[in-house]
């Protein structure tokens, strides 16, 4: 019998009701300011981060290998046989690679790591759909096969009032940011 766990990172935008219903494990990013550090969605809210951006742009750091390993140890202790990890774009974070490295240490748990090539709501929608499929009794292989099709149906657009924060936060390069600002 398959016991499937869902895991994501705190870049995922998903409501607490869905997290609770499908027992989704969320591994937090670190939010780093010059003189302080917070655990995303534990010590600091998204609203607080946005409010603080007026005075300082934080850096972020992916969930640590230790955090991922700890989550896997708990899943192993709870007799999970499979993990579906839906994570932030590998182009924005090393989370995908960290999951790959750690998951290989846990041979008793078959893992599928999905690089959303996106973030936020995209991760959340895919996880909710996976939760529904698990609840319906679908097998791991079937769910994993369905994920890329789920993603094809999702299209998101981000509109920035300014590229300043993306540039200062290190998400786009100085030259790209400057060119983008000039085109604005």
Regions found by a protein language model. Give the residues of each.
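Mixed-charge interfacial surface used for oligomerization/domain docking
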Residues: 2-5, 11-19, 24-25, 29-30, ...
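N-terminal glycine-rich anion-binding loop in soluble enzyme alpha/beta folds
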Residues: 4-63, 67
């Amino acid at each position: 019998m398959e016991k499937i766990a869902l895991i994501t990172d705190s870049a995922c935008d998903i409501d607490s009701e869905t997290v609770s219903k499908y027992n989704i494990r969320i591994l937090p990013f670190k939010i780093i300011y010059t003189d302080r550090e917070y655990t995303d969605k534990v010590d600091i809210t998204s609203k607080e981060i946005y409010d603080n951006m007026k005075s300082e742009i934080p850096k972020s750091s992916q969930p640590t290998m230790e955090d991922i390993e700890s989550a896997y140890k708990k899943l192993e202790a709870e007799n999970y046989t499979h993990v579906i990890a839906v994570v932030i774009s590998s182009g924005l974070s090393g989370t995908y690679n960290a999951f790959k490295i750690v998951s290989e240490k846990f041979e008793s748990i078959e893992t599928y790591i999905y690089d959303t090539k996106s973030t936020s709501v995209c991760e959340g929608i895919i996880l909710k759909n996976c939760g529904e499929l698990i609840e319906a009794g679908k097998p791991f292989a079937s769910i994993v096969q369905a994920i890329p099709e789920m993603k094809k149906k999702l299209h998101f657009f981000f509109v920035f009032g300014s590229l300043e924060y993306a540039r200062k936060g290190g998400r786009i390069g100085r030259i790209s940011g400057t060119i983008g600002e000039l085109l604005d």
